[in-house]
Amino acid sequence: MKRFSYDEQRTILDECKSKGEALSVALVSDSRSYEDLVYSDEVDDSVLKSLPDFMPVDKRRSVANGVPCVSFFSGAGGLDIGFECAGFRTIADVEIVPMFCDTLRKNGHRVIVGPPYAAGDMSRPDEVIAELEKIGIPKDFPGVFHGGPPCQSFSIAANQRFNKNGENFKRTGFNHAKLGNLLFCYIDVILHFRPEVFLIENVDGLLTIDGGVQSAHACELLRNAGYDVTNPRVVNAADYGVPQKRMRTIIVGSRIGHFDYPETRPQLPVGSVFKTPIDGLPNHQTREHSAESVSRYMILGYGKRDKLGRVDRLDPFKPSKTIIAGGTGGGGRSHLHPFIPRTMSVRECARIQTFPDSYQFTGPVARQFTQCGNAVPPVLAYEMACAIHKSIYAKCKSHGENRQVKVSYKPPKVCEQMLLAVERKEVELSAAQKDKGWRGKVYSEKTTRR
């Protein structure tokens, strides 16, 4: 069925407002869905065809030959995906959040130092070290450690969501009771196992908080331990093939070579990721909007903000604004779709974050947004992984042997049964959702409706 004309859409929205009828009900009764809605500046398919193509991360060239990695603060697995697509091999993940662990397992990760088998608490590095040694991670680790300690205490964007009079408004940085010291806990683990290469990822605020003293001290500790630590650099993910503006701090060190940052690439417009249909993919539920909200959204121009809902329409001809996590306690948030006057689904945000379409997020929809928005874009991780291989491993022929690390990991029987029960439930829920069909399917939560 053809999408609404602008006048048809105005009519149905006005009727909903006058009758007090939910827009979703009116759309279903007319055999329509939110996908049929249009902006006032509706564009035809020729606009999409004119945009450059985007190459998914899982279709890119593999360069490394199975160099082993251990992932810390793994989250939803963005760094893992990028390194694996570049040819590295993840042999263990360390993660404290149960839902993130569920997502990792859902996507094939089986060796996870985290709930329900272990705490995965990096604020207790001695316990993490003991767990990793138990499964066979050796000292002088012949591979890569990578991770991004939680960044909320260093983030400017995170604190803009809080009331200025609240204690969360200021960037507490290294003074944060729970999150501020995790960088140094991670360094403790690095210094114990002495991997050949390490990568630290964080927000750009890491280099400016406390006048840069703490980040400089972190680099000094690693250099004193014999690592060649490249000067930390703030990079824009949009300069490395990610169709999104996202500023991140990258620190790489090696005891077997010198790391060179990858060359930048031409920026991709966000419209490129919408050239391929998304219908039928996992995590693609759209939020329920009122007729009043859609009436406001549909008159927005490219890149403009709806001040009442505090959401922005993406400009399809430019990189996306930063995909955000939406907080840990409130509802998940996303920007407005560039071509449809509604907020984006988790899958659409994941496309912009450069996750493969096959990658699945677990948990409530709001928490899926959290996982997606917190993640390192896999394409950015891929570019850094390729640069590590090119500048270090490809030049170190003498280090090309004995990189096979075998991990021995057998979770307790009771935990194995719990995991199987969870997986069965997820399969049943997924099948039930598929029976309903996708078009017109929405979710509604009081904390997220706009």
Question: For the regions a protein language model found, what residue spans apply to each?
Answer:
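C-terminal target-recognition/interaction regions appended to catalytic cores
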Residues: 1-43, 47, 55-60, 287-450
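Acidic-residue sensor for enzyme active/binding pockets
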Residues: 95, 201, 348
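Class I S-adenosyl-L-methionine
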Residues: 130-144, 152, 156-316
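Proline-centered helix-kink/hinge sites
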Residues: 149-150, 195, 243, 356, ...
